Amino acid sequence: MDSTNARSGMKSRKKKPKTTVIDEDDCMTCSVCQSKLVKISDITKVSLDYINTMRGNTLACTACGSSLKLLNDFAS
């Protein structure tokens, strides 16, 4: 039996593209708006004028305005 005969009358489905993570592009994202954050290795290549620091280790995401903390800061 030919595969074209077995599918007659059936609609063909589009395959979903596979998401692959490229190591160079593998950086953390904001948990609220999913915008990409600066990697520590890129810190010398990027202008830091857009980073809003709050108090201590807390940063503010410029895309959505949410405050970003380290996980160990929640325990204290």
UniProtKB/Swiss-Prot annotation:
Domain of life per record: Viruses
Classification via InterPro entries: Poxvirus_A19
Major location (coarse): virion
GO-annotated cellular components: host cell cytoplasm; host cell nucleus; virion component
Compartments where found: Virion; Host cytoplasm; Host nucleus
Its job: Plays a role in the maturation of immature virions to infectious particles. May also participate in viral transcription.
Family under the similarity heading: Belongs to the orthopoxvirus OPG146 family.
Name recorded for this polypeptide: Protein OPG146
Organism: Variola virus (isolate Human/India/Ind3/1967) (VARV)
